[in-house]
Amino acid sequence: MQSCLYECRVMHHRLVPKEHKFSYRIFVLALDLDELETCHKAFTFFSLNRWNLYSFNEADYVPTYEKIHNPSQNSSIKLTPALNSSLKERVISYLALNGIDCAGGKVTLVTVPRIFGYAFNPVSFYYCYNQT
């Protein structure tokens, strides 16, 4: 299994309008999107697409049939993959619409899971690899 858990530190420091800073520990999941079912079955307190202490809901990521802003092109596209497509398929479709071919490759998502059903995820990172 390639999916894993990372302990991290979130830090913030602003100077204006009033100085404010904080730092705290969090954990993030690095999920190989081909292993979602395996992860879900391997850990008692982790669930896929349903409530648990820790859960991962695919619908929280790369929404279908909604416009997704592409800042590099200053435009929005509407992602319309097949009904009931997996998160990995939606990521691959989004990349293909932007001229990037990752079909058959690996996609790892680094993100914060839902905790007690509550989703607070300020940023997620997708690491996408082509087939070679």
How should these model regions be labeled?
Residues 1-132:
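Mature, function-bearing regions of proteins
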